[in-house]
Amino acid sequence: MTISGVLAGCPAPAKLNLFLHVVGRRDDGYHLLQTAFRLLDWGDRLDFRVRDDGLIRRTNQVAGVAEDDDLVVRAARRLQQATGTPLGADITLHKVLPMGGGVGGGSSDAATTLIALNHLWQTGLTRADLQQLGLALGADVPFFIYGRDAFAEGVGEAFQPLALPAAVYVVLSPEVSVPTAEIFSAKGLTRDTPPIRIADFAASPTRNDLQATACSRYPEVARAINWLEHYAPARMTGSGACVFAEVASEIEADEIVSLCPARWKAWKAKSLARHPLYGLLD
């Protein structure tokens, strides 16, 4: 909903990495990746109200995240500094996505903040401008601003559109938080997977190169994959901890979700062709 100075219920959708290959490492330590990003219809929501006094405030508490550390607040301040706008904002974050889950929660929240405030503040930045701002906040932020399924390379910021059929997924959180930096810095991590071409994506064998390391350090991730494998081929998304499986129907997804062990959480999610706020940057 939008009225003058307000955007309410702005979606911050989750993402899946349908595969994730580490194909090299730059001299500065950043890993070179190939991945297929997929948007989901499941995620957080944010409300924005413009302030005339220039203050950026998060109006609610988010467990375990101080206001100044929140990517939402940092994104708003970064846009404010980059554009010189005198305006501020009150931001309310309705958190659903698990933190440290590999579904892009914080990055998606930051991207939605950049898109929504660029619109409300009328700062006039382009999609490419916002992607550049977002990259400094997190490697996944540019994808959410890109706003559609993509084949990504580089450190995850170079995109090609990916045409994928609609799909239904079960996403399972084993209720552990996996620090991305820990997984990428692990000595045993595979860093030399041969690159594939986008044209070969559907026919090529793929995997998540981070999965073995995450499973060895966080056995609950391995247990979640093994459980979900009883119903459909499963793998980890991102650096974990969430795991997912594509299923044939919403009915099947609902049934699997209902059987999820009580110590974990599970959701049904459908694919999204485009980010719900995509049109704000057209």
From Swiss-Prot:
Q: Which residues bind ATP?
A: 98-108
What Enzyme Commission number(s) apply to this enzyme?
2.7.1.148
Q: Which reactions is this enzyme annotated as catalysing?
A: 4-CDP-2-C-methyl-D-erythritol + ATP = 4-CDP-2-C-methyl-D-erythritol 2-phosphate + ADP + H(+)
Which InterPro entries has this protein been placed in? GHMP_kinase_C_dom, GHMP_kinase_C_sf, GHMP_kinase_N_dom, IspE, Ribosomal_Su5_D2-typ_SF, Ribsml_uS5_D2-typ_fold_subgr
Q: In which pathway does it act?
A: Isoprenoid biosynthesis; isopentenyl diphosphate biosynthesis via DXP pathway; isopentenyl diphosphate from 1-deoxy-D-xylulose 5-phosphate: step 3/6
Q: Which GO terms describe its molecular function?
A: 4-(cytidine 5'-diphospho)-2-C-methyl-D-erythritol kinase activity; ATP binding
| Pfam families assigned | GHMP_kinases_C, GHMP_kinases_N
User: Is Protein transport among this UniProt entry's keywords?
Assistant: no
The active site annotation covers 15, 140
State any GO BP term from the record.
terpenoid biosynthetic process
* UniProt keyword list: ATP-binding, Isoprene biosynthesis, Kinase, Nucleotide-binding, Transferase
Which family is this protein grouped under? Belongs to the GHMP kinase family. IspE subfamily.
Briefly, what is this protein's role? Answer: Catalyzes the phosphorylation of the position 2 hydroxy group of 4-diphosphocytidyl-2C-methyl-D-erythritol.
Q: Which HAMAP family match?
A: IspE
NCBIfam families for this protein? ispE
| The protein's name in its UniProt record | 4-diphosphocytidyl-2-C-methyl-D-erythritol kinase
> Corresponding gene?
ispE
